Amino acid sequence: MYLTIEETAEYTNLSEDYIKSLVLEGKIRAVHDGEQFLIYKEQFKTHLEQLENYKALVQEILNEPIPEDIDVKDED
Protein backbone atom coordinates (compact mmCIF):
# COMPACT_ATOMS: atom_id res chain seq x y z
CA MET A 1 0.00 0.00 0.00
CA TYR A 2 1.31 3.43 -0.92
CA LEU A 3 0.71 6.63 1.02
CA THR A 4 0.98 10.28 0.07
CA ILE A 5 3.24 12.59 2.07
CA GLU A 6 0.19 13.83 3.99
CA GLU A 7 -0.92 10.28 4.85
CA THR A 8 2.63 9.29 5.79
CA ALA A 9 2.90 12.29 8.12
CA GLU A 10 -0.32 11.24 9.83
CA TYR A 11 0.78 7.59 10.01
CA THR A 12 4.18 8.43 11.55
CA ASN A 13 3.05 11.42 13.66
CA LEU A 14 5.60 13.66 11.92
CA SER A 15 5.10 16.89 10.02
CA GLU A 16 4.51 16.91 6.27
CA ASP A 17 7.50 19.22 5.76
CA TYR A 18 9.77 16.82 7.63
CA ILE A 19 8.53 13.81 5.64
CA LYS A 20 9.03 15.71 2.38
CA SER A 21 12.57 16.70 3.37
CA LEU A 22 13.38 13.06 4.20
CA VAL A 23 12.04 12.00 0.79
CA LEU A 24 14.07 14.66 -1.01
CA GLU A 25 17.21 13.65 0.93
CA GLY A 26 16.63 10.02 -0.04
CA LYS A 27 16.18 8.86 3.55
CA ILE A 28 12.65 7.65 2.79
CA ARG A 29 12.12 5.71 -0.42
CA ALA A 30 9.34 7.12 -2.56
CA VAL A 31 7.99 7.05 -6.11
CA HIS A 32 7.03 10.26 -7.88
CA ASP A 33 4.01 9.76 -10.15
CA GLY A 34 4.28 13.16 -11.82
CA GLU A 35 2.05 14.90 -9.30
CA GLN A 36 2.99 13.63 -5.87
CA PHE A 37 5.34 11.36 -4.00
CA LEU A 38 4.01 7.94 -3.08
CA ILE A 39 5.63 6.20 -0.14
CA TYR A 40 5.46 2.45 0.50
CA LYS A 41 3.87 2.04 3.94
CA GLU A 42 5.54 -1.26 4.86
CA GLN A 43 9.01 0.32 5.02
CA PHE A 44 7.97 1.83 8.38
CA LYS A 45 6.64 -1.40 9.89
CA THR A 46 9.91 -2.61 11.40
CA HIS A 47 10.84 0.84 12.64
CA LEU A 48 7.49 1.36 14.36
CA GLU A 49 7.64 -2.12 15.92
CA GLN A 50 11.11 -1.40 17.30
CA LEU A 51 9.91 1.95 18.62
CA GLU A 52 7.02 0.27 20.47
CA ASN A 53 9.39 -2.35 21.93
CA TYR A 54 11.75 0.40 23.09
CA LYS A 55 8.90 2.34 24.72
CA ALA A 56 7.76 -0.82 26.54
CA LEU A 57 11.31 -1.48 27.76
CA VAL A 58 11.71 2.08 29.05
CA GLN A 59 8.35 1.88 30.81
CA GLU A 60 9.35 -1.43 32.41
CA ILE A 61 12.59 0.12 33.70
CA LEU A 62 10.76 3.17 35.04
CA ASN A 63 8.19 0.99 36.84
CA GLU A 64 10.81 -1.20 38.51
CA PRO A 65 10.74 -0.48 42.26
CA ILE A 66 13.83 0.81 44.02
CA PRO A 67 15.00 -1.61 46.74
CA GLU A 68 14.21 -0.37 50.24
CA ASP A 69 17.48 -1.50 51.83
CA ILE A 70 20.36 -0.40 49.69
CA ASP A 71 23.48 -1.94 51.21
CA VAL A 72 26.03 0.61 50.18
CA LYS A 73 29.14 1.18 52.22
CA ASP A 74 30.19 4.78 52.10
CA GLU A 75 33.92 4.90 52.68
CA ASP A 76 34.40 8.66 52.55
From Swiss-Prot:
This is Uncharacterized protein YoeD. Pfam families: HTH_17. One of its GO terms (molecular function) is DNA binding. Transmembrane segments: none annotated. InterPro entries: HTH_17 (IPR041657), SinI_DNA-bd (IPR010093), Tn1545/Tn916_Xis (IPR038148). It comes from the Bacteria.
